[in-house]
Amino acid sequence: MTNYAIILAAGKGTRMTSDLPKVLHKVSGLTMLEHVFRSVKAISPEKSVTVIGHKSEMVRAVLADQSAFVHQTEQLGTGHAVMMAETQLEGLEGHTLVIAGDTPLITGESLKSLIDFHVNHKNVATILTATAPDPFGYGRIVRNKDGEVIKIVEQKDANEYEQQLKEINTGTYVFDNKRLFEALKCITTNNAQGEYYLTDVVAIFRANKEKVGAYILRDFNESLGVNDRVALATAETVMRQRITQKHMVNGVTFQNPETVYIESDVEIAPDVLIEGNVTLKGRTHIGSGTVLTNGTYIVDSEIGQGSIITNSMIESSVLAAGVTVGPYAHLRPGTTLDREVHIGNFVEVKDSHIGEKTKAGHLTYIGNAQVGSSVNVGAGTITVNYDGQNKYETVIGDHAFIGSNSTLIAPLEVGDNALTAAGSTISKTVPADSIVIGRSRQVTKEGYAKRLAHHPSRSK
């Protein structure tokens, strides 16, 4: 059995009120088009054809070489859009799935079941339908007394009886590929919209006594077509519930799943504890036994097992096992933390590698640095890495002790086991096993405070 797919992605999406093409709006971190394309892969199509139109280059860039593309210059209806794909699929034997690119909730399992139903019933066309609580706006499925599908009626063309029908057309179909394009040559624009309706091919098949069937979705949510921001928010809510439920089934604990945002490509190992208001985005991986506390935000990062992240932001970073971060820390892109590193409150790290068991507990900036293992970085330490034009590197050796309020002016190297005195400004190499003091000598002038205007003795 050979399958093909046509994805309709040419529309502008006027009701979205956006410069972005409708199918490129995101749901849980992926564009709607990407969600649809991933689900389509479940039927293993020999060839996928995406129909593009409005801002076509932007849409094409999302799928790149994963799909063939055809251009619909004028948007003259769904039937017209499918006609554009004939140049890619003409004369091929097999079954063609037609699906809209704005249906992000459709699952691969449902599409696979649709194809199987179509093949097993030897249909020339199969419509994916659903039972809608409120069918207004949808095309209605009209059946005869034997339950056979005889036609699909659009909302604007439906009579009073047809408008009461609850079974709706989801806009997804499977056709015999050759018969699809033969039938499309017979449809017209004689309807309320003045467009070529893809649904008109059903009546053509019925007139020829060819078999048309309908496969009913189990979950109405999968039928959602996103036409405005309200529907986009609905899709986001449903997708978020799916994602959190999937992780819970796989052994992840959520204290308040309704407040958590996790994108589609995030991976979470078992026995992770996630508190409320946590955000996980991009290609993030969370290792087993890790705890993410309230307010943590992580994007495109790897967190090792048994780590504890407390109310902190982590971007494009790699953390080994047993790391503790926060509260209120910020790990910026390019950060690597080895095992059992501790990054404490109000510490910022950027584009730096920090060795095992090193600690930076408070109020510190580490940028463009290579820090060894078992280093203590005192509170208030700053790596001065930028001169206004270029960034420079700081290298700190193993077991070094950086005193509080040290200012390390890069490029700089501090050797193994070296110590910088608190309050020092260091601008030259510190050899291994050295102590460096880079501050002015304290001068004490006894009794001088009595000369100051605010001294208590002056108010008498």
Curated annotation (Swiss-Prot):
Species per Swiss-Prot/TrEMBL record: Streptococcus pyogenes serotype M18 (strain MGAS8232)
Location of the region described as N-acetyltransferase in the Swiss-Prot/TrEMBL record: 251-460
Catalytic activity field: alpha-D-glucosamine 1-phosphate + acetyl-CoA = N-acetyl-alpha-D-glucosamine 1-phosphate + CoA + H(+); N-acetyl-alpha-D-glucosamine 1-phosphate + UTP + H(+) = UDP-N-acetyl-alpha-D-glucosamine + diphosphate
Main location group: cytoplasm
Pfam families (UniProt xref): Hexapep, Hexapep_GlmU, NTP_transferase
Cofactors: Mg(2+)
One of the record's GO cellular component terms: membrane
Protein name: Bifunctional protein GlmU
Keyword Nucleotidyltransferase: yes
EC number: 2.7.7.23, 2.3.1.157
Role: Catalyzes the last two sequential reactions in the de novo biosynthetic pathway for UDP-N-acetylglucosamine (UDP-GlcNAc). The C-terminal domain catalyzes the transfer of acetyl group from acetyl coenzyme A to glucosamine-1-phosphate (GlcN-1-P) to produce N-acetylglucosamine-1-phosphate (GlcNAc-1-P), which is converted into UDP-GlcNAc by the transfer of uridine 5-monophosphate (from uridine 5-triphosphate), a reaction catalyzed by the N-terminal domain.
UniProt entry keywords in alphabetical sequence: Acyltransferase, Cell shape, Cell wall biogenesis/degradation, Cytoplasm, Magnesium, Metal-binding, Multifunctional enzyme, Nucleotidyltransferase, Peptidoglycan synthesis, Repeat, Transferase
Pathway the protein acts in: Nucleotide-sugar biosynthesis; UDP-N-acetyl-alpha-D-glucosamine biosynthesis; N-acetyl-alpha-D-glucosamine 1-phosphate from alpha-D-glucosamine 6-phosphate (route II): step 2/2; Nucleotide-sugar biosynthesis; UDP-N-acetyl-alpha-D-glucosamine biosynthesis; UDP-N-acetyl-alpha-D-glucosamine from N-acetyl-alpha-D-glucosamine 1-phosphate: step 1/1; Bacterial outer membrane biogenesis; LPS lipid A biosynthesis
Residues that bind acetyl-CoA: 379, 385-386, 404, 422, 439
Cofactor note: Binds 1 Mg(2+) ion per subunit.
Active site, renumbered: 362 (proton acceptor)
List of residues binding UDP-N-acetyl-alpha-D-glucosamine: 8-11, 22, 72, 77-78, 139, 154, 169, 227, 332, 350, 365, 376
Location in the cell: Cytoplasm
Gene name of this polypeptide: glmU
GO function term, MF aspect, one: magnesium ion binding
Residue span of region Pyrophosphorylase: 1-229
Presence of keyword Methyltransferase: no
InterPro entries: Bifunctional_GlmU, GlmU-like, GlmU/GlgC-like_hexapep, GlmU_C_LbH, Hexapep, NTP_transferase_dom, Nucleotide-diphossugar_trans, Trimer_LpxA-like_sf
Region (Linker): 230-250
